[in-house]
């Protein structure tokens, strides 16, 4: 019975995810799901990346996921973009956003006038990988401070993602991290994974990321 319940939950989520994909396909909106551990730099990345997309004429929306607080959404307010906050605490404090939460959030956005919508998922390397949000692109952000073994310890996250961002590369001179080995570990789990080293603080790699997303949008 327990296995059946789990299967039913995932099946229900997948049906809603398919509905989300149909909706964003109709509006020609690229839905991007950002996943990572807490503190990997997702919000800082959005603070720097969104203006770069806006400078190219693209309209952006954000769905902010956290267990509690609106702190990350408040950081993005100066960008003058539509932001929908989802706090999971009222729903049991889930450590992920599922399609059942993303779908009503999309109802609050004018998708017809948005080119990109970024989901900033709840900080966790486990749960978010298990639930399809309906995103067109899954992105994992892994900071250099987390070590090179994370792809091997949390393989599902890297298996379900299309893109891996190795963040905070400006800290590499202060760390004992083998960047080539980290790449190898990522590709061992997912040989099709695209990998960009980035530093949101310095701007390194952000132009490549912007262009990669724009190419997908076209």
Where in this protein do the model-derived segments appear?
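Phosphate/Mg2+-binding loops and adjacent switch elements
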Residues: 119-182
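Nucleotide-state-sensitive switch-loop elements of NTP-binding domains
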Residues: 3-22, 26-32, 40, 49-135, ...
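The Walker A (P-loop) glycine that initiates the GxxxxGKT/S ATP-binding motif of P-loop NTPases
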Residues: 36
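Canonical P-loop GTPase G-domain recognition
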Residues: 171-218
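Active-site glycine-centered loops adjacent to acidic/histidine catalytic or metal-binding residues
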Residues: 66, 167, 199
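Walker A/P-loop
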Residues: 43
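Residues at the starts of beta-strands that form the adenosine-phosphate
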Residues: 59-60, 137, 162, 194
């Amino acid at each position: 019975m327990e296995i059946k319940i789990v299967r039913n939950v995932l099946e229900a989520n997948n049906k809603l995810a398919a509905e989300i994909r149909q909706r964003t396909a109709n509006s020609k909106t690229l839905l991007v799901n950002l996943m990572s551990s807490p503190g990997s730099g997702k919000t800082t990345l959005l603070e720097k990346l969104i203006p770069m997309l806006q400078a190219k004429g693209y309209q952006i929306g954000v769905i902010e996921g956290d267990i509690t607080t609106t702190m990350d959404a408040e950081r993005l307010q100066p960008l003058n973009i539509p932001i929908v906050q989802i706090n999971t605490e009222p729903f049991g404090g889930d450590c992920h956003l599922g399609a059942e939460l993303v779908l009503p959030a999309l109802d609050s956005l004018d998708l017809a006038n948005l080119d990109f919508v970024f989901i900033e998922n709840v900080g966790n390397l486990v749960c978010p990988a298990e639930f399809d949000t309906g995103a067109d692109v899954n992105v994992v952000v892994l900071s250099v401070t987390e070590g090179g073994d994370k792809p091997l310890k949390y393989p599902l996250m890297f298996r379900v993602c299309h893109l891996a961002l190795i963040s905070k590369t400006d800290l590499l001179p202060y760390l004992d991290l083998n960047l080539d080995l980290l790449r190898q570990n990522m590709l061992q789990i997912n040989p099709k994974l695209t990998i960009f080293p980035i530093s949101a603080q310095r701007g390194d790699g952000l132009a490549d990321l912007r262009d990669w997303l724009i190419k997908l949008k076209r």
